[in-house]
């Protein structure tokens, strides 16, 4: 019988040795928001608490400066 194994979640920022998450790095921030514009929780992404706080504040700062949208484009 086949068993399904889930991949172990790990914090990419800890593994790469990132000291601070930059709000201008839009490519990285887009990986942590949904299509509708919500911030993805750390239990889904595996991000540690320290970097999840930095990530959420960076996303909010990028939204305020209009680098990221608050919601998806309504068509």
Swiss-Prot record:
Gene3D superfamilies documented for this protein: Ribosomal protein S18 (4.10.640.10)
A Gene Ontology molecular function term of the record: small ribosomal subunit rRNA binding
SUPFAM superfamilies membership: Ribosomal protein S18
Paired cysteines (S-S): none
Pfam families listed in its UniProt record: Ribosomal_S18
GO biological process annotation, one example: translation
Annotated signal peptide: none
Any one GO CC term of the record: cytosolic small ribosomal subunit
PROSITE patterns: RIBOSOMAL_S18
Record keywords: Ribonucleoprotein, Ribosomal protein, RNA-binding, rRNA-binding
InterPro entries: Ribosomal_bS18, Ribosomal_bS18_CS, Ribosomal_bS18_sf
Record's subunit section: Part of the 30S ribosomal subunit. Forms a tight heterodimer with protein bS6.
Family to which this protein belongs: Belongs to the bacterial ribosomal protein bS18 family.
Primary role: Binds as a heterodimer with protein bS6 to the central domain of the 16S rRNA, where it helps stabilize the platform of the 30S subunit.
HAMAP family assigned: Ribosomal_bS18
Protein name: Small ribosomal subunit protein bS18
